[in-house]
C-alpha cells in the first residue's frame, strides 16, 4: 500500500532537517540531504519509507560523529562510545566509522601522533604514561608503539621540560622540600626515579646560579 507525500516542511529548530507528511499527517523527520529527491505528490511504498528512515539514521549518525570530531581529534573507540550513547545501532555505528575512515576523519595512528605531540609540547610526560593514556583511548599497542617510535625527544629532555614548568613555584623551598615536591610531580608524570632526580638537580642548580635567585633558595646543599 502506497502513501502520498502531501507536504515537506522545514523544521523550525533545525534548518538542515525537514518534516515529511504522508497522506496529510506527520510521518517522520529527514535530513535535507536524504529528502532531496522527495516532493509533494510523490507516492512511496513501505519499502521506500523504510529505506528513507534507515538512510536518515545513517546520515544523522555521520553528522553526530562530525560534530563530536569538531571539538578535537578522537580515537575510533571514542566515536563508537559517543554514538552508542546516542542510541545508534551497532550496524549504523560500524558504517559511520567506515565512512569517517574513508574521509580520513578518523585515523588512530594520526590521532596518537597528535596526542603525543600535544603532550610533549604543553604537558611533557614519559612514554610509559603516554602509552597508558592512549590505551585508555582504545588504541591498540601496535598503533601506539608505531606512533611513539616517531618521537625524537629524549625522555631526559621531556623530564627537564616538565620540571621547568613547575620549578618556579617551588623556588623558595629548601633543597629537601624542593626535591620532594618536584620529584613527586615528575614521578606522577611517569618518569623513572633516576630520570626525575636528574631533572630536579639540573633545575635546582640553574635556579641557584641565576643572578636574581632569592637568597633563601640557596640555603641547603644537594645531598642525595
Q: Predicted regions: what is each one?
A:
Residues 1-224:
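An alpha-helical, amphipathic repeat domain used for nucleic-acid recognition
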Amino acid at each position: 500500500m502506497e502513501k502520498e507525500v502531501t507536504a515537506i516542511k522545514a523544521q523550525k529548530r533545525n534548518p538542515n532537517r525537514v518534516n515529511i507528511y504522508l497522506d496529510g499527517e506527520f510521518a517522520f523527520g529527514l535530513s535535507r540531504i536524504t529528502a532531496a529527491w522527495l516532493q509533494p505528490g510523490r507516492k512511496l511504498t513501505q519499502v521506500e519509507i523504510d529505506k528513507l528512515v534507515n538512510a536518515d539514521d545513517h546520515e544523522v549518525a555521520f553528522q553526530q560523529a562530525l560534530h563530536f570530531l569538531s571539538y578535537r581529534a578522537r580515537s575510533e573507540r571514542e566515536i563508537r562510545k559517543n554514538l552508542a550513547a546516542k542510541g545508534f545501532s551497532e550496524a549504523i555505528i560500524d558504517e559511520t566509522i567506515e565512512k569517517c575512515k574513508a574521509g580520513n576523519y578518523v585515523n588512530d595512528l594520526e590521532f596518537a601522533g597528535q596526542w603525543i605531540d600535544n603532550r610533549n609540547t604543553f604537558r611533557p610526560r614519559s612514554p610509559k604514561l603516554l602509552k597508558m593514556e592512549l590505551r585508555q583511548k582504545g588504541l591498540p599497542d601496535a598503533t601506539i608503539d608505531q606512533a611513539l617510535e616517531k618521537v625524537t625527544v629524549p625522555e631526559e629532555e621531556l623530564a627537564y621540560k616538565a620540571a621547568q614548568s613547575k620549578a618556579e613555584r617551588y623556588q623558595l623551598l629548601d633543597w629537601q622540600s624542593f626535591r620532594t615536591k618536584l620529584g613527586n610531580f615528575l614521578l606522577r608524570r611517569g618518569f623513572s626515579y633516576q630520570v626525575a632526580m636528574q631533572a630536579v638537580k639540573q633545575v635546582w642548580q640553574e635556579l641557584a646560579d641565576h643572578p636574581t635567585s632569592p637568597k633563601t633558595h640557596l640555603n641547603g646543599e644537594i645531598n642525595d
